[in-house]
């Protein structure tokens, strides 16, 4: 049993055993980001450590993936969870879903004693929200991992479920975003003969590369895992380049499908493309990168407008009990319409696309917030 730490609450000096936890003023952060809830997770028996962040439930229960990642600090994990939860709220609002944004983040560390047990423990945490938070897979977690979580929670969507082709739904949305971006650049809607650089060939990047090849596009791709890259190249005919060389490829589109924050001032300056459209979350390292891309004549399709396919399917299955889940190509058409609207508004107003998308999403939240706030789950 852990030893109880005692502390004089009137003292202004942090307790020496907990001083390292005081890097973030959590309540100030919650007020600044308008967060509803932050839950810290700890299961000593399995080594589970992480956070669930719920940003906003005025439109409905929070939905967001769960990721397992090697963060340098707990602060970094919490900051990532917050950014992703806020983006999920906007993604749901922009897609017209009766849902809000949340995120689960697990810290990958040497102290994980039982991976399967850790995932079942995470499922129990999700279950404890009682339908306030729905989740599925994200970076670092496989379909089998999410199935483990599903064993202990009704509120977990398994991406490999035959009814829920989550990767396919998102991939079709990415292609829809690409068509809209090509058209906005004056290149027409067709992907036939277009050159597309795909960064990251995990489950999502591989699916996008396969669809692009089927559409007749030339795929240039990279992944830090040589074996994974080789398999995708063999099945799609993609030309492989070194991971750091993706920024220097002359192409029509750049498609980030790996980790967050890949678009920095430095990488944006190296791009030789007409547009950026990808499946990765939180692609911009900083808000000003959006404006830098615009100044360079590179169209940016905001990530949460593009990668909403999986969340749309999840919301339909869990919240609306819809059975029409097979026409995932139609989700691509919806994304194409949304991205077209964003890029046309950006061209007309001179505002960067990310700012336009944020405004459209926030406007969709104004009406619910103007009435009495609803705190899910309703009783």
List each language-model region with its residue ranges.
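N-terminal ligand-binding/catalytic initiation module
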Residues: 2-161
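Predominant activation on well-ordered alpha-helical scaffold segments within soluble catalytic domains
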Residues: 78-85, 116-127, 147, 171-179, ...
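Flexible, glycine/charged-enriched surface loops at secondary-structure junctions
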Residues: 92-97, 132-137, 187-194, 243, ...
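Short, surface-exposed connector motifs at secondary-structure boundaries
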Residues: 129-131, 192, 213-218, 268-275, ...
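Glycine-rich phosphate/diphosphate-binding loop of Rossmann-like nucleotide-binding domains
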Residues: 165-255
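Rossmann-like adenosine-cofactor binding region
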Residues: 224-301, 305
């Amino acid at each position: 049993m852990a030893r109880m730490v005692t502390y004089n609450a009137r003292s202004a000096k942090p307790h020496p055993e907990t001083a390292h936890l005081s890097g973030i003023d959590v309540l100030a952060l919650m007020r600044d980001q308008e967060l509803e809830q932050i839950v810290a997770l700890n299961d000593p028996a399995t080594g589970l450590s992480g956070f669930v962040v719920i940003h906003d439930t005025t439109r409905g229960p929070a939905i967001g993936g769960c990721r397992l990642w090697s963060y340098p600090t707990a602060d970094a994990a919490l900051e990532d969870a917050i950014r992703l939860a806020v983006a999920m709220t906007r993604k749901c609002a922009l897609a017209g879903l009766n849902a809000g944004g949340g995120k689960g983040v697990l810290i990958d560390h040497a102290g994980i004693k039982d991976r399967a047990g850790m995932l079942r423990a995470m499922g129990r945490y999700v279950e404890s929200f009682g339908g306030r938070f729905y989740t599925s897979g994200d970076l670092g977690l496989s379909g089998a991992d999410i199935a483990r979580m599903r064993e202990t929670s009704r509120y977990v969507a398994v991406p490999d479920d035959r009814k829920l082709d989550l990767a396919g739904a998102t991939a079709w949305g990415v292609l829809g975003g690409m068509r809209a971006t090509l058209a906005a650049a004056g290149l027409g809607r067709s992907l036939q003969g277009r050159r597309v650089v795909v960064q990251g060939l995990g489950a999502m990047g591989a699916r996008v590369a396969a669809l692009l090849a089927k559409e007749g596009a030339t795929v240039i791709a990279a992944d830090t895992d040589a074996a994974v890259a080789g398999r995708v190249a063999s099945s799609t005919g993609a030309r492989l380049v070194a991971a750091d060389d993706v920024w220097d490829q002359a192409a029509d589109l750049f498609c980030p499908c790996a980790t967050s924050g890949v678009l920095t001032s430095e990488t944006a300056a190296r791009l030789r493309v007409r547009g950026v459209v990808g499946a990765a979350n939180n692609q911009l390292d900083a808000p000003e990168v959006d404006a830098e891309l615009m100044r360079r004549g590179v169209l940016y399709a905001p990530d949460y407008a593009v990668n909403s396919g999986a969340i749309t399917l999840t919301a339909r299955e869990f919240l609306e009990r819809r059975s029409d889940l097979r026409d995932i190509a139609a989700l691509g058409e919806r994304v194409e319409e949304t991205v077209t609207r964003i890029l046309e508004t950006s061209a007309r107003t001179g505002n960067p696309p990310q700012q336009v998308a944020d405004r459209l999403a926030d406007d969709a939240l104004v009406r619910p917030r103007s009435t009495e706030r609803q705190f899910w789950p309703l009783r």
